[in-house]
Amino acid sequence: MKKILALLLVLALSLTLVACGSGKKDAASAGSYKVAMVTDYGDITDQSFNQTTWEAVVAFGKDNNVETKYYKPTSNDTAGRVASVELAIAEGYNVIVMPGYAFGGTIVEVAPNYPDVKFVALDVAKGDLLETAVANKGESYDYNPDNWKLEDYVDLSNVYCAIYQEELAGYMAGY
């Protein structure tokens, strides 16, 4: 019985290794991307969100032979962030990384106009997006995202939002 179990385990492991792939890159290889990061109102030496994000973008670029660049908005408002995102796109960057909830309005204004560009938004929640999207339709937002369907207001199919469960770290730290 032990020999049969060991044989099945070896067979399962060998199939797992075979399934790991041939080492070929898929059709949308990382080399076809140019990644830009737009800072919020800080810069890439803030020892916080912007710096951490920029370091990750640079590491990804080096590991995957992808061109990277960062842009700092000239003003601390949605218009400044929109201008920086549009400049990055005009310069050929097709993946835009944006760290922070301040990009909610920027995403709603820019992403639908550039369906071939991918947007990665860090710490941008549904409510951050809804606030601008609902206002753009002339409606009043009640700050309860569960009452709204974002897709009824704006197409953000080219946007990925990563939300951190900050409450878990707070709990573990005793807060």
Tell what function each PLM region has.
Residues 24-175:
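A residue-level marker of the well-folded mature domains of exported/periplasmic proteins
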Residues 1-33:
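Short, low-complexity disordered leader/linker segments with a strong preference
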